[in-house]
């Protein structure tokens, strides 16, 4: 038997194989990885500044607590598209429009929105979407438009939104969100307005956040301060005031509120002589935030009974805690902290903070868009609640049971105000669609194909939902019957697209138990001869 002799070393063919085979394996591995790897930015979003931003109707990765809600919105969006593209047998295609929710979907400790705020805002917008889609058409997709946790990646988002406005089949109805009064939000607001896209800010309150196409469902800081003025006329206290303000120069909200409080109450409450600043926690690193030791000492040494707070709600618990630790305070005299905002942040009503407030005889007085007094402990509308609250509560409670929106999910007002912002746009599109497809004369046939309103039609409908006077009273013309009240908008240099006749309740926490804050202030009511409807 002849045995083969083993060669010693590599020949030319061996060397070629040794080189080619690893290269082929590497190439195959790269292809497999590219095919199977998770997308950098799912849902068609793009990577900008290290974050996934853009506009999508599909699911993507936000904060972990948002996963269920984001998937729910994506599923509803897919259902809406199927009802138009491939309706069930025997059903006519259901036309639909698109409303974009432009805000962060991720957060960190310095973000403009906390994770809890984002969750409540998304739940409110989705509740409005479900409510709108439960009735006759048109129906709506809720596009998700993440613009970065610091709101600074808005440019590619605005470009993506602009590309949707000329879609005649399923047009962009408008944009909602822009959740914080920052320089970045102001730039985004102005750019959307320049492109003539109707935009609604659900929780914008800085009085100088104005542009022709920018509508606000919340009152602004000036209106909140006026509501506090009405409260103080009834409850003046000892007029020994003190102003605590956020010193960040780039915080549009806090700077605007600081100026307004000084202007309104500076002389009567001695705020020019008694004030202290602190560094707010929202924004880039600039030192140690929430240092309230100096403010607390000065409040106690001056025996101030009325503290005006010009800062964000995230920082207020730290002030309350520092005041409770201040040994120089005379606990015999009550102190009240006056603030403005969308509602009552749950961090202000924890058992721990409530105990501190009671022990130190301190009370928070808040002029707000929303008050917990509007609903009962069982989650039903209370006496005197806005007409549109009940329908929202029914849908929202179902979402809360399924996805767990969080503790006291209504109290800060975000869910309610985001609901109203979506509803404002969907109502305007509904009316524009109906008018565009009115049946001429006695013809009861719908025009075929149905006419689709443009973004300009939606804007013109929005600015004509106003208040008129008749027979000694005021009447609404297409007012929004929102979960936060019945209010209107009109094109006027006086109103700047801020809500007309929006209620501003004043909240006392812990509650006094008697008396109460008095009559509810309504925006622009003093410009009319008769009470708001």
What is the predicted role of each segment?
Residues 405-412, 426-516, 531:
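Segments of small-molecule ligand-sensing domains
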Residues 214-283, 305-306:
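An alpha-beta-alpha
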Residues 116-120, 135-208, 497-498:
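Beta-alpha junction/loop-to-helix N-cap segments that form part of ligand/metal-binding clefts
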Residues 1-98, 473, 479, 501, ...:
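Long terminal accessory regions outside catalytic cores
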Residues 326-420, 437:
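Extracellular/periplasmic periplasmic-binding protein-like sensory domains
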Residues 42-156, 417:
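N-terminal extracellular/periplasmic Venus flytrap/periplasmic-binding protein-like
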Residues 165-180, 197-202, 242-246, 299-319, ...:
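Periplasmic-binding protein-like
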Residues 200, 207-230, 354-381:
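Short beta-strand elements at the ligand-binding edges of bilobed clamshell
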């Amino acid at each position: 038997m002849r045995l083969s002799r083993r060669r010693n070393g590599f020949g030319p063919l061996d060397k070629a194989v040794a080189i080619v085979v690893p290269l082929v394996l590497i190439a195959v591995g790269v292809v497999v990885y590219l095919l199977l790897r998770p997308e950098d930015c799912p849902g068609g979003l793009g990577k900008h500044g290290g974050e996934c931003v853009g506009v999508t109707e599909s699911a993507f990765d936000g904060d972990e607590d948002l996963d269920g809600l984001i998937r729910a919105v994506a599923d509803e969006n897919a259902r809406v598209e199927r009802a138009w593209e491939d309706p069930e047998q025997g059903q006519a295609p259901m036309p639909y429009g698109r409303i974009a929710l432009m805000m962060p979907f991720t957060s960190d400790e310095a973000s403009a929105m906390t994770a809890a705020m984002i969750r409540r805002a998304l739940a409110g917008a989705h509740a409005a979407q479900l409510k709108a889609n439960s009735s006759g058409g048109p129906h709506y997709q809720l596009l998700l438009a993440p613009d970065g946790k610091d709101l600074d990646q808005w440019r590619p988002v605005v470009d993506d939104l602009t590309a949707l406005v000329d879609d005649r089949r399923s047009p962009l109805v408008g944009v909602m969100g822009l959740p914080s009064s920052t320089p970045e939000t102001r730039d985004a607001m102005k750019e959307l307005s320049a492109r003539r896209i109707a935009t609604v800010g659900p929780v914008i309150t800085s009085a100088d956040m104005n542009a022709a196409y920018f509508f606000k469902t919340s009152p602004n800081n000036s209106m909140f301060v006026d509501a506090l003025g009405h409260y103080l006329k009834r409850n003046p206290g000892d007029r020994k005031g003190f102003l605590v303000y956020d010193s960040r120069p780039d915080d549009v909200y806090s700077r605007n509120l600081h100026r307004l409080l000084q202007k309104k109450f500076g002389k009567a409450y001695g705020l020019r002589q008694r004030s202290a600043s602190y560094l707010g926690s929202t924004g880039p690193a600039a030192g140690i935030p929430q240092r309230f030791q100096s403010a607390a000492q000065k409040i106690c040494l001056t025996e101030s009974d009325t503290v005006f707070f010009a800062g964000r709600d995230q920082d207020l618990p730290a002030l309350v805690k520092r005041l409770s630790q201040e040994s120089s305070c005379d606990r015999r005299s009550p102190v009240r902290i006056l603030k403005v905002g969308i509602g009552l942040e749950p961090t202000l009503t924890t058992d721990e903070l409530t105990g501190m407030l009671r022990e130190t005889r301190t009370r928070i007085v808040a002029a707000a868009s929303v008050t917990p007094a509007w609903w009962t402990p069982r989650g039903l509308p209370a006496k005197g609640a806005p007409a549109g609250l009940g329908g929202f509560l029914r849908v929202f409670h179902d979402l809360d049971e399924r996805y767990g929106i969080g503790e006291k999910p209504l109290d800060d007002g975000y869910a309610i105000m985001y609901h109203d912002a979506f509803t404002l746009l969907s109502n305007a599109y509904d009316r524009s669609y109906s008018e565009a497809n009115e049946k001429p004369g006695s013809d009861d046939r719908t025009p075929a194909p149905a006419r689709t309103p443009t973004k300009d039609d939606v804007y013109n409908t929005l600015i004509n939902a106003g208040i008129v006077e008749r027979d000694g009273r005021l009447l609404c013309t297409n007012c929004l019957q929102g979960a936060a009240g019945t209010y209107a908008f009109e094109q006027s240099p006086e109103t700047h697209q801020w809500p007309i006749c929006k209620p501003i309740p004043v909240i006392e926490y812990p509650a006094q138990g008697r008396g109460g804050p008095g009559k509810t202030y309504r925006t622009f009511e003093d410009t009319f001869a008769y009470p708001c409807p």
